[in-house]
């Protein structure tokens, strides 16, 4: 992502992911968001980053993902000297692809060196990425208690399964934004398709997570959705580093 001649502001929606981002000479780790926020890129500035899919953040970070919920931290503050050295190397690269390759290599190594990745949470996160999934059924399906499931989600994702379910459902709505704008489908039908109890439920979640009504959100996002991502579940984003795990974000 590059800034225009004037400062470029972009609204960031919660998506269940943790990002490693290089911007303005700083290497930042953006924790999992629970509400939308605005990111600005100065004129002529660039942002390069990688997105970690829901469920692997805790392993890559080396600490509970919940500690970075709704927060941005310098890599040195999370990874110490390793984070500082990575920031220096990325800063020495002169092109975007070189920086992206360094970030991808670093995340792949941290994932390989991690003691373990919580495969149960990964499986649960994938299930929540599709319409028709029910949080209430996850514990029984995975053979653990509700309390254990919540704890493991907080460690690996950054918040509980209900919050992730709400966020992924919002992402599915965003993918339907073109249909909302063209009025090919009404909001009540879309809400039902995506697993909302009714249109009012969709409206409440949109306001809670973004501060916008469903229609306003659709208008704001319709022209920002890549055609290849429309109608696809959030966990179906293009993968750059390793299957199912780390996806590119620019």
List PLM regions with ranges.
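Alpha-helical bundle regulatory/interaction domains
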Residues: 1-146, 156-161, 175-197, 213-250
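A glycine-rich, hydrophobic loop/mini-helix early in the fold
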Residues: 210
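DNA major-groove recognition helix of helix-turn-helix
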Residues: 153, 165, 205-207, 218
């Amino acid at each position: 992502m590059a800034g225009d001649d004037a400062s470029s502001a972009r609204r960031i929606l919660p998506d269940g992911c943790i990002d490693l981002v290089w911007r303005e000479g700083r290497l930042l780790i953006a924790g999992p968001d629970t509400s939308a926020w605005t990111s600005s890129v100065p004129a002529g500035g660039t942002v390069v980053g990688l997105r970690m899919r829901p469920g692997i953040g805790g392993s890559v970070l080396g600490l509970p993902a919940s500690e970075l919920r709704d927060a941005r931290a310098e890599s040195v503050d999370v990874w110490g000297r390793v984070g500082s050295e990575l920031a220096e190397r990325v800063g020495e690269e002169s092109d975007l692809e070189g920086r992206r390759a360094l970030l991808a290599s670093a995340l792949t190594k941290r994932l390989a060196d991690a003691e373990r990745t919580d495969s149960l949470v990964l499986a649960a996160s994938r299930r929540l990425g599709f319409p028709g999934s029910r949080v209430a059924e996850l514990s029984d399906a995975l053979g653990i208690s509700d309390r254990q499931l919540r704890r493991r989600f907080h460690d690996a994702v950054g918040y509980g399964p209900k919050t992730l379910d709400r966020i992924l459902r919002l992402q599915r709505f965003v993918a339907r934004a073109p249909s909302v704008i063209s009025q090919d489908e009404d909001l009540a039908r879309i809400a039902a398709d995506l697993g909302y109890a009714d249109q009012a439920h969709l409206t409440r979640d949109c306001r809670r997570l973004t501060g916008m009504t469903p229609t306003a959100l659709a208008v704001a996002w319709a022209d920002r959705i890549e055609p290849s991502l429309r109608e696809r579940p959030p966990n179906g984003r293009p993968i750059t580093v390793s299957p199912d795990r780390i996806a590119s974000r620019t």
